[in-house]
């Protein structure tokens, strides 16, 4: 009988040692992959965050006067860098040619003319004198006067004929000993030149018949003729003279040819009118103004 208490005592000691061993063993953390997923308040796994959608790809088609080629190319790079997904496609030419292309159905979101005349002819808000065909291509409320330019008399390097003013140009034309370049009659710079000749009382047709005038289909062609010294002088915009490195010997006054205003407008048939308006707004901001002013434009909007 004395063996039973001893046996019970031994069993108690064994159970006590086993319990101590269980308490001393450190807990093993579950592998990271087995950790419970984050849950919502309802106890369900939280949905994974979806990546932000890529910006919609937009191609803006902009028709702009040839005299804006350098500045608008620089602004394109600035705008596209700040607006991923937007691509600007330009069509540079004379404002008269661009107007005709718009009339014939060419795709265009935004039109910038080198003179009000071409824009007026597309704007239904203009009277019959300015818009004789009653065309309606301009989105109402979008039109702004964007820039002002100057009409300049320029000469080739070295100024071989010594022309230093419009007054001297007129005297040389009357004497018939000069070859002079100007834009065609459907080109704004040509129309401004016609006003200057009329201001001085000269007959353009007689001068052309006498072989004293050569023509360019846009301001860039006139600029090239002077740059290459194919003529003795020419009339272009001050901004084109700056970009081409030509010497300006005189600048026309408002009395001579009027104010040189560049209007801009979104077109009614624009595929992306909101984006076109945003681009137009950008071009009236400080970054674009700095580019325009660097070549001689005067921002108006």
State where each predicted segment sits.
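Positively charged n-region of N-terminal signal peptides that target proteins for export
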Residues: 1-11
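Alpha-helix termination/capping residues and helix-transition junctions
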Residues: 14, 104-105, 228, 273
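C-terminal motif of bacterial Sec signal peptides marking the signal peptidase cleavage site
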Residues: 15-19
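Exported/periplasmic ABC-transporter solute-binding proteins
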Residues: 21-41, 47-81, 96, 115-116, ...
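Hydrophobic anchor at the start of a short beta-strand
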Residues: 88
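Short beta-strand-centered segments that line the small-molecule binding cleft or hinge
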Residues: 99, 105-134, 140-145
């Amino acid at each position: 009988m004395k063996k039973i208490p001893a046996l019970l005592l031994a069993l108690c000691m064994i159970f006590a040692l086993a319990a101590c061993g269980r308490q001393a063993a450190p807990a093993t953390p579950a592998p990271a992959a087995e950790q419970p997923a984050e849950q919502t308040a309802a106890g369900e796994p939280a949905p994974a965050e979806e990546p932000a959608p890529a910006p919609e790809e937009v191609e803006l088609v902009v028709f702009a006067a040839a005299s804006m080629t350098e500045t608008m190319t620089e602004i394109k790079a600035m705008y596209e860098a700040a607006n991923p997904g937007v691509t600007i496609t330009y069509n540079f030419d004379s404002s008269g040619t661009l107007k005709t292309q718009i009339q014939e159905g060419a795709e265009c979101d935004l039109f910038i003319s080198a003179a009000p005349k071409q824009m007026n002819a597309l704007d239904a808000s203009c009277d019959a004198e300015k818009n004789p065909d009653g065309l309606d291509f301009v989105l109402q409320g979008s039109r702004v006067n964007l820039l002002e330019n100057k009409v300049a008399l320029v000469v080739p390097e070295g100024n071989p004929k010594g022309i230093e003013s419009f007054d001297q140009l007129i005297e040389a034309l009357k004497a018939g000993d000069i070859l002079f370049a100007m834009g065609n009659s459907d080109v704004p710079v040509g129309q401004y030149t016609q006003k200057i000749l009329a201001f001085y009382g000269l007959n353009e047709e007689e001068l052309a018949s006498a072989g004293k005038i050569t023509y360019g289909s846009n301001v860039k062609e006139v600029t090239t003729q002077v740059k290459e010294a194919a003529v003795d002088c020419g009339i272009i915009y001050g901004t084109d003279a700056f970009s081409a490195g030509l010497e300006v010997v005189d600048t026309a006054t408002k009395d001579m040819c009027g104010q040189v205003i560049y209007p801009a407008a979104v077109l009614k048939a624009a595929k992306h009118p909101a984006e076109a308006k945003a681009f137009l707004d950008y071009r009236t901001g400080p970054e674009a103004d700095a580019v325009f002013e660097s070549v001689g434009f005067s921002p108006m909007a």
